[in-house]
């Protein structure tokens, strides 16, 4: 047996030629136990600088705006919390019924013509549940609110437009899938590959669904807007609000969506 181990434990024992006292062992053991107790204490999450359970609770700081945005029929309770300018989250308990209930989001206003923008990029990082029905997406508007461009980064449906969440479309398959029908497939632009859907919701809606879902990345929004323009959907629009959040159709029992890092860079 190792002479420096006590009863097989990892604490030091008596050294050769030294006087060994039981109280020394007791004091050492007490110190180890206290250290272990301290290390087991969880580090508390950073307290939010703002939170709201109001349907349209909103908050702004450093040019960024947050909105709880609970707008759908039959919506349940939801609380949005902001921890830092680029870090926020939402707890949402939405029933398992059809229709989008909410779009909690963070936003940044650009307010410039597309032709005068030399760069427009955004980075994201999020943690999302594995069940429910939802899509994490950019929602980009022109200043006149006549054009809405959605970029789905992660979602519970399928890239082909089928599943429990579907993009707005002029055409849906007349089969059990009821899938939205894309107008373009496998378009490589803005740093990813997308399927593109076109529809109308009181205004023109162009939805791009990533063919490979992800919880982190960087999107070249300028390149995507230029590609859409090249297809004749709009001219030199004035880019308005760039939003990022989650469209929640259902999150029964309450689910957490955490946005760990989100930013927009515009030049």
Identify what each model region corresponds to.
Residues 191:
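Conserved, mostly hydrophobic/aromatic
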Residues 211-267:
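Long, compositionally biased interface segments
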């Amino acid at each position: 047996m190792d002479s420096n181990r006590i009863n097989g434990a990892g604490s030091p024992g008596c050294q050769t030629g030294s006087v060994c006292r039981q109280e020394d062992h007791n004091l050492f053991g007490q110190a180890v136990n206290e250290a272990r107790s301290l290390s087991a204490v969880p580090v508390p999450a950073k307290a939010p600088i703002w939170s709201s359970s109001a349907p349209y609770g909103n908050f702004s700081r450093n040019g960024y705006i947050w909105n709880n945005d609970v707008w759908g029929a039959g919506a349940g309770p939801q609380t949005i919390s902001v921890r830092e300018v680029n870090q926020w989250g939402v707890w949402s308990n939405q029933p398992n019924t059809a229709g989008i209930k909410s779009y909690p989001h963070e936003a940044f206003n650009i307010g410039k013509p597309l032709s005068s923008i030399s760069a427009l990029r955004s980075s994201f990082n999020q943690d999302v549940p594995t069940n429910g029905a939802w899509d994490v997406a950019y929602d980009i508007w022109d200043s006149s609110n006549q054009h809405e461009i959605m970029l789905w980064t992660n979602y519970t449906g399928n890239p082909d437009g089928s599943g429990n969440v579907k993009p707005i479309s002029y055409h849906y398959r007349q089969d059990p899938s009821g899938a939205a029908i894309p107008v373009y497939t496998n378009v490589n632009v803005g740093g990813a590959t997308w399927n593109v859907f076109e529809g109308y919701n009181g205004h023109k809606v162009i939805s791009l669904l990533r063919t490979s879902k992800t919880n982190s990345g960087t999107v070249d929004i300028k390149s995507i807007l230029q590609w859409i323009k090249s297809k004749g959907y709009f001219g030199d629009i004035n880019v308005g609000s760039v939003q990022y959040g989650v469209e929640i159709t259902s999150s029964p029992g309450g689910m957490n969506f955490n946005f760990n890092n989100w930013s927009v860079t515009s030049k």
